[in-house]
């Protein structure tokens, strides 16, 4: 059994920030459970293009509002507390935060914890498990 608090993660290498976002990596690949679980905050007024080419991501929005645009087909979705989206086709997408957005995110395969988005908006492929 693993029990962690966000207070324990704050200020550690599991506490990762980028331009306009902050992520607390609660469950990671080294936990050996087959997925990773993150609490991610997107700053109000920011726009991000992501393209998880090597991961499936499920996102549940717990606070804030914004817009999700599927850049593959142009579909636009309004997001608010209780909204969920699943990127099960590695869709390139744009996230626009009207207010600060807090999201709970699950990645498969799990991330290692230090990943940041590359120029295409992707995380690198997960390392092979030995």
From Swiss-Prot:
Pfam families: Ectoine_synth
Catalytic activity: (2S)-4-acetamido-2-aminobutanoate = L-ectoine + H2O
InterPro entries given in the database record: Ectoine_synth, RmlC-like_jellyroll, RmlC_Cupin_sf
GO BP term, example: ectoine biosynthetic process
UniProt cross-references to CDD domains, sorted A to Z: cupin_EctC
GO MF, one example: ectoine synthase activity
Enzyme Commission code(s) on record: 4.2.1.108
Pathway membership, UniProt: Amine and polyamine biosynthesis; ectoine biosynthesis; L-ectoine from L-aspartate 4-semialdehyde: step 3/3
Enzyme class at the top of the EC tree: lyase
Domain of life of the native organism: Bacteria
UniProt keyword annotations, A-Z: Lyase
Protein's job: Catalyzes the circularization of gamma-N-acetyl-alpha,gamma-diaminobutyric acid (ADABA) to ectoine (1,4,5,6-tetrahydro-2-methyl-4-pyrimidine carboxylic acid), which is an excellent osmoprotectant.
PANTHER family registered for this protein in UniProt: L-ECTOINE SYNTHASE, PTHR39289
Sequence similarity: Belongs to the ectoine synthase family.
Protein name: L-ectoine synthase
Biological classification of the source: Bacteria, Bacillati, Actinomycetota, Actinomycetes, Mycobacteriales
